[in-house]
């Protein structure tokens, strides 16, 4: 879902509201020889969306390959992956964010009252100060650099937004583009309402419609989209989540006389038109230092992960609300632990309580229940700052003594360096923020700081997710089409042991011990040797398996093997952390520390 980097409180994942009927048209006309769609995106970080977008040196234009797939270029702004659409006749260019945490496509209308007539002067604040205490006053001058409206939430206030745009709330709409329906000869409005709100207090409302629509030469006309004639977000969204999360189905404001339904969103349109064979896609976000990554619709790239690819079911945490099928990408976390260095006696299990986890590419950092974050913070030496709601700690600089956070998803393990979850406050400071924030919600959100080290395949047809440790070495592509199931993926040992009800999080246990004679191998950073052209499609030869091996030969509570992601200068930052939105974030944190 689309969450601001500066979100202080995330109590609601997504709020959808009233829509009567979005309507569905014929499927698009797509080339019959295409079997998957490939999106290569660039990762950029800047003090604002506009500044990052202006940095276009070396940026590749959208293009179409002549062989068996479509190539679409994306850019990543503050952990948001964006793509440029052509809408209408004649075509108008509009940029939208690609989001796994929502399912609708909407664009900003040219009549949006929040749009300024020219790029916003950053001397004026675009933030509503709910509680003008001393802290808010200190950081106000820093916050003005963000060009979309949001609400700063303090302990004495709750997040709100109103639908009346004031001068201080105006946003720059020119950078990402708007859609003028009156200038398109082919636009058809359904005259039905669209409305959606996000956890960062951005919102959009307007009407549903249809028009000529394409991503470069990839014609996706027939995909329903909404034109937001009122939004406080600088950019629209291309949601690629489950159909149950479409606002026509899960909108909380649907009245009793408004029938809820699902429609064919972007991944479904690709399948039903024949451009891909399954409603599935894989995400390779690449490591935090890289400037590029990949989304494959309808395919998996075996060269982008290390070890085995394990499959687990998507779970339904909203069945009690009447949803018979899952509506968001949630899976079961069966254990959370840490390791210190390369010593096997330094393995620690924080909990084995089953907790729902949302995998969300639209969230920059990660969020966990308050009590679980406290367990983790105590283990890694972080202390809580009540001034702004995050844990702080010393930045990690000695790689040989580095700790890692280990996630048990059901008998297979994914590991991230602790420094991957650290946010550098200032290059001259040794203080880092733990990029796992506490929240009152009993679920977990794993955002970009987790996904950057994980290869994820979202199988919407089978309601499953497959994951493996990401492989950052440049070993070429081993792309295989996804048909009835994800090729080469193994069912996780704990596939059937899923979350069923919310429980209090209990500390302790041993997630590194399972049934007798079972063996799990884990590779945090593994390179693959190139395969010959005559080898089977998707096969790979592993040249290094030194990262991590967890051997389980008994059912006792002791564990054997080493748990340590391999050190690699190509995948690690020497300064002991990853800068989030520099230099803005550095100035924001520096201002806070000067105040407290």
Curated annotation (Swiss-Prot):
Task: Please convey what the UniProt record notes about how activity depends on pH.
Answer: Optimum pH is 4-7. Optimum pH is substrate-dependent.
User: What is any Pfam family matched here?
Assistant: Asp
The EC number(s) this enzyme carries: 3.4.23.41
| Compartments it resides in | Cell membrane
Q: Where is the composition biased (Low complexity)?
A: 530-570
Q: Does the keyword Zinc-finger apply?
A: no
The protein's name is Aspartic proteinase MKC7
Lineage at the top is:
Eukaryota, Fungi, Dikarya, Ascomycota, Saccharomycotina
